[in-house]
UniProtKB/Swiss-Prot annotation:
Protein's UniProt keywords contain Amino-acid biosynthesis: yes
Subcellular location: Cytoplasm
Any one of the GO BP annotations: L-histidine biosynthetic process
Domain of life: Bacteria
EC code: 5.3.1.16
Reactions it catalyzes: 1-(5-phospho-beta-D-ribosyl)-5-[(5-phospho-beta-D-ribosylamino)methylideneamino]imidazole-4-carboxamide = 5-[(5-phospho-1-deoxy-D-ribulos-1-ylimino)methylamino]-1-(5-phospho-beta-D-ribosyl)imidazole-4-carboxamide
Gene Ontology CC: one annotated term: cytoplasm
Name this protein carries in UniProt: 1-(5-phosphoribosyl)-5-[(5-phosphoribosylamino)methylideneamino] imidazole-4-carboxamide isomerase
Species, as recorded: Listeria monocytogenes serotype 4b (strain F2365)
PANTHER family linked to this entry: 1-(5-PHOSPHORIBOSYL)-5-[(5-PHOSPHORIBOSYLAMINO)METHYLIDENEAMINO] IMIDAZOLE-4-CARBOXAMIDE ISOMERASE
Length: 240
């Protein structure tokens, strides 16, 4: 299972949120470039980067920093946050970013998602962020009446190959991932699934790997030292 250390960017710094709440922000490193390099040095093979400013503004805000992070880390990166037009997708991918994550727009503008997938294939990752099973958009500020499973099925139909599923109620809480919802997704869609939200321990990563998922994202637990990069490297190499 591929495990992605997460770096969330706000005002040029690495931060962690609690349940997606921008008012509950903790700065974990003032230097995101050094953080990206440190993760790679310690064995990370792919980074998950979210431009929180971009998620709020609806346009790329931190691209220059992200490019410098990728250059320092020398490993692939996937980036999300405020990517709502083909011009923005082009902008990121032409600048050397490996994959882009389309979140809110996957629900609000499905034609855009379809066009992006047709143009870029596996370089497009769809993000589903849900609260109590219902999809949230616009930096998690708005909650829709669309269920996470319905949206996943729609995404599969338009050709999406990889979906990141975030349970907002668990994000940044260290309460464990939502294994039930991940298992439900695994049963009903045949895309590569990445779990996000709530990972608190090596045991959580092992439980997700045992579901047969493609990947998992580790954030707060890494910064709190509840999970080490050596844990991540070891779990990635275990065949479940």
């Amino acid at each position: 299972m591929q495990i992605f250390p997460a770096i969330d960017l706000k005002n040029g710094q690495c931060v962690r949120l609690f349940q997606g709440d921008f008012s509950k922000k903790t700065v974990v490193n003032e230097d995101p470039i050094a953080q990206a390099k440190a993760f790679a040095t310690d064995g990370a093979t792919y980074l998950h980067i979210v431009d929180l400013d971009g998620a709020l503004e609806g346009r790329p805000i931190n691209l220059e920093i992200i490019q410098r992070m990728k250059k320092a880390a020398k490993i692939p990166v996937q980036v999300g946050g405020g990517i709502r037009s083909m011009a923005q997708v082009d902008y990121y991918l032409e600048s050397g970013i490996d994959r882009v994550i389309i979140g809110s727009a996957a629900l609000t503008n499905p034609d855009f998602l379809r066009a992006a997938v047709q143009k870029y294939g596996a370089k497009i990752v769809a993000g589903i962020d849900a609260k109590n099973g219902f999809v949230a958009t616009r930096g998690w500020l708005d909650v829709s009446q669309v269920s996470y499973l319905d949206l996943a099925k729609r995404m599969e139909k338009v050709g999406v190959e990889t979906i990141i599923y975030t349970d907002i109620s668990r994000d940044g809480t260290l309460t464990g991932p939502n294994l039930e919802q991940m298992a439900n997704l695994k049963e009903h869609v045949k895309v590569s699934l990445i779990a996000s939200g709530g990972v608190s321990s090596r045991a959580d990563l092992e439980a997700l790997a045992q579901l047969g998922l493609y990947g998992a994202i580790a954030g707060k637990a890494l910064y709190n030292h509840d999970i080490s990069m050596s844990d991540i490297v070891e779990v990635e190499q275990i065949a479940y």
